[in-house]
Each structure stands twice: as C-alpha cells, then as structure tokens.
A protein has these predicted regions:
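Conserved binding/catalytic microenvironments
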Residues: 2, 6-300
C-alpha cells in the first residue's frame, strides 16, 4: 500500500506540473477509488502502520492542492481536512504544515483572509521553522493582510518573506521545500503588491515570474499580471500580453488561472476608457479560454 500511494503522489505531482490541475483530475478520481481511506469513510487505527498512514496523508494533501487549483473548493476542503486527520494519526508534522499552507491559500481565495491568517498561524511549532517554510508562512500572511487592507503589514510581511528566503535551504527543510524558489517568491511578491495597487513595483516582479520557465501552475502569475495591467491602465502592455497568452490559453490546466484571465478580459471588454483594439483582443482571449472560464466571465 505504501509504495502504491507514493507512486500515486509522484504521478499526480508530475501531471500537475506538466499539464495542470484539470488534466490531473481523472488521476485524482482514480486515487479516491483506489484508496478508500481518502474519502473519510474509514479511518486507520492510531499507531497502526505509521508509514502507510503517512503516505495516505501526503496523497490527500496533493489531492487537496489539485482540487483547489482545479476550482473544486468544496472537495478541496474535504481533502485538506482528511489530510490533517491522517497527519494527526501518524504524527507527520511536515505534511500537516504543507496542508495548512495550502488551506490558508484556499481561504484567501475564498475571501476569508482572517481564516487564512488563523490557519497560517497553526504552522508554527515549539522550534523555529526552517527559512523556506517560514517564508511560505509569511507569504500567506502577506496575501491575507493585503486583502484585509493592511498595507503596511502586508509590505512588512512580504519583505520579511524575501529576507527569510535568502537565508537559504538547510538540512532541516522538509522534502517539499524544493518548489519554493526565486520565481515562486517573485510571483507572490508582485501579486501582494498588486493587491495593494503598487503598480511600479508589482508589474516588473509579476512580469519576471510570468516569463520565467517553470511548472504549469505558474501560469497563474501571467494571469495576475494581466489583471494588474488592466487595473493599472497599461493598455499597450496588456495588449502585448494577450497576444502572447491567447494562443496557449486553451491548454492552461488551472481553473484559478483561467478564471483570473477571464475576469481580467471581461473587465477590459467593459472598460469605458479601454482602446478598441484591446477590447477586441480581450474578446479573442475569452474565446480561447476553456468554456467554463469564459462563460463565468460573461455578464448574465
């Protein structure tokens, strides 16, 4: 059971990185069928086969992440709750922390920034966190603080996240810390600053993150860049970005990304000061997006 669960984790992570969360959904459904413990209908007894329960906890964490990025928030809540239950049973504090960090992001996406802050606070323990993990906590807190309107606090937190990131990796970091890299941090720095309307600083950071090579889920930074350009009134840059995004929009496998793109494009179409050429480009982008995202952005 443990090797099988571990192989499933590897397969799901690879699918998500290469093709996105929506492409990974069929494999998620198979995993839920193959491992009934993930559904919550059965609970492994405490203290029994700790390695097996830890593998199931990690699998449930990955499932929760994919469901979130695929836009299935209710199911993501369930998977995260299940992962947390399993980590309690096996004592896997690192998978528990990663699940809490994922859930904090989900809560911010659902306009629950106070809940996000409470969840992020649960990541701490009796010992100081490794730098990369602490950086992630600070990133989650910065996003939530920005949504709450705490401009000074959000800036302080995202600056502190950069400082902690620069402290580097250590032997105390969990195995999943590899994906917290420079481009991930750049994207979140830009995104937090865009939430605050600090376009002069946000746009270059988002552009660097959006144009860097990386896994599929980082298309989100390109979507956030378009949303920021639209809000900043940077029409020429928005037109250039749409020209780059539209040919590959149909293949984006993240519902978060396609919804953000659809929202930005829809706003550009309705804008009273938006040039006609940009409105046409925004309409074209909507046509290129997967149908559910395009439909959700169109006025009723």
């Amino acid at each position: 059971m443990t090797p099988s669960a571990a192989r499933t984790v590897e397969r799901l992570v690879a699918l998500d990185a290469a093709r996105g969360a929506t492409a990974a959904l069929p494999a998620v459904r198979r995993a839920l069928r193959d491992f009934p413990e993930l559904s919550g209908d059965t609970t492994p007894p405490r203290g029994r086969d700790v390695d097996r329960v830890a593998a199931l906890a990690e699998l449930s964490e990955v499932v929760g992440w994919i469901l979130f990025d695929a836009g299935l928030h209710r199911q993501a809540h369930r998977a995260n709750a299940r992962a947390l239950t399993l980590t309690e049973l096996c004592g896997d504090r690192w998978t528990q922390r990663l699940t809490l960090l994922n859930h904090s992001m989900l809560q911010t996406a659902e306009a629950d920034p106070r809940g996000s802050l409470e969840t992020a606070a649960r990541v701490a323990g009796p010992r100081p966190l490794p730098a990369r993990v602490d950086s992630l906590v600070l990133i989650r807190q910065a996003h939530a603080s920005a949504v709450l309107g705490g401009r000074r606090e959000a800036r302080r937190l995202i600056s502190r996240a950069r400082s902690r990131f620069l402290d580097g990796l250590s032997r105390h970091d969990p195995h999943w810390a590899w994906w917290i890299d420079e481009n991930e941090l750049l994207g979140h720095e830009g995104w937090v600053l865009a939430r605050l309307g600090d376009w002069d600083r946000a746009l270059p950071l988002l552009h660097r993150a959006a144009t860097a090579p990386g896994p599929s889920y980082r298309h989100l930074f390109g979507a956030e860049l378009l949303a920021a350009l639209a809000r900043a009134g940077a029409w020429t840059e928005a037109l250039d970005l749409i020209a780059d995004l539209a040919p590959r929009a149909a293949a984006i496998g993240s519902a978060r990304t396609t919804r953000t793109l659809a929202g930005a494009a829809s706003g550009l179409r309705r804008g009273t000061r938006v040039p006609a050429s940009l409105k046409d480009a925004a309409a074209h982008l909507l046509e290129c997006l997967p149908a559910p995202a395009a439909r959700s952005a169109r006025p009723a």
